Swiss-Prot record:
Entry's Gene Ontology BP terms: translation
An example Gene Ontology molecular-function term: structural constituent of ribosome
Source species: Synechococcus sp. (strain CC9902)
Gene designation per UniProt: rpsB
Taxonomic placement: Bacteria, Bacillati, Cyanobacteriota, Cyanophyceae, Synechococcales
InterPro entries associated with the record: Ribosomal_uS2 (IPR001865), Ribosomal_uS2_bac/mit/plastid (IPR005706), Ribosomal_uS2_CS (IPR018130), Ribosomal_uS2_flav_dom_sf (IPR023591)
UniProt keyword Ribosomal protein, yes or no: yes
Alphabetized CDD domains for the sequence: RPS2
Pfam families in the record: Ribosomal_S2
Family recorded in the similarity comment: Belongs to the universal ribosomal protein uS2 family.
Key words, A-Z: Ribonucleoprotein, Ribosomal protein
GO cellular component assignments: cytosolic small ribosomal subunit
Protein name: Small ribosomal subunit protein uS2
Domain of life: Bacteria
Length: 239
């Protein structure tokens, strides 16, 4: 059975690429045609890539690999958090901070600081501090939760990075490649397929397209880990 059908992808608008003047020629192998100045992605090839991505991701999950979902643009942010949580993956959905991967020791210290502040807040320790000091600590807590909240279960570097928008997340791409971490990437017509190990050519701007692709990848991770794609707890990433 196909992981995703042509009709599902059509309904999600997965076939709409960017304006023809904004394309990357390396994506030509995945482009069906140009219509009204917009490239149309070949969904038959997308379906093949989705099948490959599903199998690859399921196999990686089965062997105990840890995943990081990355998508910081507005239309992807909520989906990234929901689907990552559903399959027990870590995620970044607000802003990629330089060194999230390449300066992991420092980033891990900031995550530990976040956990400490959360414990202080839940125990009432912050409320017991002088008003000004408590306000400073709460602002720090809010900032860390916003940018690092999705990484709290990540005790070490991920084995796989799943990307929504390759061009927007160029810093994440550079860091992952520097550390030889494989990338599973949604690729719009302005992307470079040579910069990822597992390409998924599709519209990376439409919410429904992002939901469809990330939903299937989360299913693959759950199936690889648990033998089914049902939702499980989010503690599988730790260890």
């Amino acid at each position: 059975m196909a992981v995703v059908t042509l009709s599902e992808m059509m309904e999600a608008g997965a076939h709409f690429g960017h304006q023809t003047r904004r394309w990357n020629p390396k994506m030509s192998r995945y482009i069906y045609c140009a219509r009204n100045g917009v490239h149309i992605i070949d969904l038959v090839k997308t379906a093949v890539c989705m099948n490959n991505a599903y199998k690859w991701t399921r196999s990686a999950a089965r062997s105990g690999k840890r995943f990081l979902f990355v998508g910081t643009k507005k239309q992807a942010s909520e989906v990234v958090a929901l689907e990552a949580a559903r399959c027990g993956a870590a995620y970044v959905n607000q802003r990629w901070l330089g060194g999230m991967l390449t300066n992991w020791t420092t980033m891990k210290a900031r995550i530990d600081r976040l956990k400490d502040l959360e414990r202080m807040e839940s125990s009432g320790a912050i409320a017991m501090r002088p008003k000004k000091e408590g306000a400073v600590l709460r602002r720090e807590l809010e900032r860390l939760q916003k940018y690092l909240g999705g990484l709290k279960t990540m005790r070490r570097l991920p084995d796989v990075v799943v990307l929504v928008d390759q061009r927007r997340e160029s810093n994440a791409v550079l860091e992952a490649r520097k550390l030889d971490i494989p990338l599973v990437s949604m690729l719009d017509t302005n992307c470079d397929p040579d910069l990822c190990e597992v390409p998924i050519p599709c519209n990376d701007d439409a919410v429904r397209s992002v939901q469809l692709v990330l939903g299937r990848l989360a299913d693959a991770i759950n199936e690889g880990r648990h033998g089914s794609n049902e939702q499980r707890g989010g503690d599988d990433y730790e260890g």
